[in-house]
Amino acid sequence: MKLFLVLIILLFEVLTDGARLKKCFNNVTGYCRKKCKVGEIHEIGCLSGKLCCVNDEENKKHVPFKKPHQQPVEKLSVQQDYVILPTITIFTV
């Protein structure tokens, strides 16, 4: 019976932060730590007051996304208060 009580208590025990490293938020590829390792830089702070440590070498591998070049849109000569959308109904088919 005592062993059963110990098992029940251990099931409801909450693990501390040391069990698994938390990832940073805002799509930053890093981990929340008190001190960054050698070769890591801190980008932003985490919610728990720790640093968001990002591996500097791995961060350089990622190429920033480039937006495709858009051609200028021709403007209408008449100012319209609404947008005309193409619609298809049963009667037009």
UniProtKB/Swiss-Prot annotation:
A biological process from GO: defense response to bacterium
Protein biosynthesis as UniProt keyword: no
Major location (coarse): secreted
Protein location: Secreted
Disulfide bridge positions per record: 24-52, 32-46, 36-53
Stretch forming the signal peptide: 1-18
Protein name, per record: Beta-defensin 128
Protein family membership: Belongs to the beta-defensin family.
Keyword Secreted in annotation: yes
Keywords assigned by UniProt, alphabetized: Antibiotic, Antimicrobial, Defensin, Disulfide bond, Secreted, Signal
Its biological purpose: Has antibacterial activity.
GO cellular component: extracellular region
